Design a protein with these regions (language model features):
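C-terminal motif of bacterial Sec signal peptides marking the signal peptidase cleavage site
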Residues: 12-15
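N-terminal cap/lid segment of alpha/beta-hydrolase-fold proteins
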Residues: 25-70
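Mobile cap/lid helix-loop segments that gate and shape the active-site cleft of serine hydrolases
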Residues: 41, 194-241, 247
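Short beta-strand element of the alpha/beta-hydrolase
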Residues: 72-83
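Short amphipathic alpha-helix adjacent to the substrate-entry channel of hydrolases
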Residues: 90-112
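Alpha/beta-hydrolase active-site loop
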Residues: 125-146
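Primarily recognizes the serine-hydrolase "nucleophile elbow" in alpha/beta-hydrolase
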Residues: 139-202
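C-terminal catalytic histidine-bearing segment of alpha/beta-hydrolase fold enzymes
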Residues: 249-263, 269, 273-309
Length: 309
């Protein structure tokens, strides 16, 4: 019993030291980021920094979720969906992704969720503005890895639908993919050269549909901020960026393949999210020797944890 009291004192001292270190860390991050840590939207003891500016534009803001305890082993940079006309960084904490995000936090992986310029944002230059915002967010995150005590060289880019396109556009080209270990694309499109979709869907003609549907034609022109040139189409054809040196791709699409439904109407869910897009991406990965995975091999969180080992 005589050794019990000194042991208790030592444990209390170490506990206080850890608490002080945690407080100092949070204070330093708050000072650097210009925001105050708040309650995590996922609950628990994770540390949450909301609406951090990664640039000066209206929607260049991101949220940071740091796991409780020790330094993070890596980070997932997430881009929300919404057809480039809607959506928010808070979508990362919705029920659809809740289990995945919680699993990552429980395994000491930080989560960063970014907003980006929409096609409805004043002054946008079409989809390229959103893609380049993804690059800006990634560069900002890389510059803060040491501050946030996140292991360098351990980044996964992820997104749903439109956000998956941002993740792929940045993940498949150098130097954007520096330190990126994987790309997680859910409900993904295979290219933002929309004419490439004629190779995805048999019998699909983009120009024919544009002529038949004024609404679709308006969306097309909004997407590119006007009639695109061949060079502008090439700039967003991220499927052609893929090569063997790129990080592994995880792609998961479940929508069907009937672009025109039984009522003779265009099914935008199929057009944007068909499994054919995933197949077209996997075909390119095979052709160039890029590693790829999907739901039949592993879950999204298992993929992230594997590539960040």
């Amino acid at each position: 019993m005589k050794n019990f009291f000194p042991l208790v004192v030592i444990l209390l001292y170490l506990s206080c030291e850890k608490s002080n270190d945690s407080h100092d860390f949070i204070s330093a991050v708050e000072s650097e980021l210009g925001v105050t840590a708040t309650t995590s939207p996922l609950g628990g003891e994770s540390v949450f920094f909301e609406s951090v500016a990664y640039g000066s534009a209206e929607r260049q803001q991101l949220d940071i979720l740091l796991p409780a305890g020790d330094a993070s082993k890596g980070v997932l940079l997430f881009f929300h969906g919404g057809g480039f006309t809607a959506g928010d960084k808070s979508n990362a904490y919705d029920e659809f992704l809740l289990e995945t995000m919680q699993t990552l936090l429980d395994n000491d992986i930080a989560i960063v969720s970014a907003n980006y310029t929409l096609l409805t944002t004043t002054g946008n230059e079409g989809v390229l503005s959103a893609l380049e915002d993804g690059e800006t967010a990634l560069n900002y995150l890389r510059s803060k890895l040491n501050l946030l005590e996140i292991t360098t060289g351990k980044v996964v880019l992820a997104g749903v639908s439109a956000g998956a396109g941002i993740a792929q556009w940045n993940g498949f080209q150098t130097p954007n993919n520096n330190q990126v270990q994987g790309v997680l694309a859910i409900a993904a499109q295979s290219s933002y050269n929309l004419y490439e979709w004629e190779n995805v869907f048999p019998g699909f003609s983009l120009d024919a549909l544009r002529q038949l549907s004024p609404n679709l034609n308006a969306l097309f022109l909004q997407f590119y901020n006007g009639e695109p040139t061949a060079q502008e189409l090439a700039e967003v054809e991220y499927r052609s960026f893929m090569d063997a040196s790129d990080p592994p791709l995880y792609v998961y699409n479940i929508a069907g393949d009937q672009v025109v439904n039984a009522q003779g109407e265009l099914d935008f869910d199929v057009l944007y999210h068909s499994y054919r897009h995933a197949d077209y991406l996997r075909l390119q990965a095979i052709n160039v020797g890029q590693e790829f995975s999907g739901v039949f091999q592993e879950s999204p969180d298992a993929f992230v944890l594997r590539v960040l080992e």
